[in-house]
């Protein structure tokens, strides 16, 4: 219901503003949210997390492009570099049950949230390895 209302221009700005105030007041801005086929541990005060919660998707064009490429090349593994809350990894794990995913993010808070997401989605978590460090071509 909220995801549909958030597409109406007036509510698009009103819902996040009101929600942030309410959640701050009750100190309940973090928790598990059902995002289509899986649960994610998200923080409503984080702008990316908030977009995922309200729209039930994130970067739809990029995700579709990536899914098409993985399908075309019949990929066996996927490197999610800068995984943040794990949305890309979770979507890929759902779409490609046979693929192995290696997710990297140097941010401890992002890894904490992604780790909580993996705990809640045990079947999916078997395909994903999460690492709390960044990858770069520089030392």
Question: Where in this protein do the model-derived segments appear?
Answer:
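Phosphate/nucleotide-binding beta-alpha loop and adjacent structural elements of enzyme active sites
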Residues: 1-139
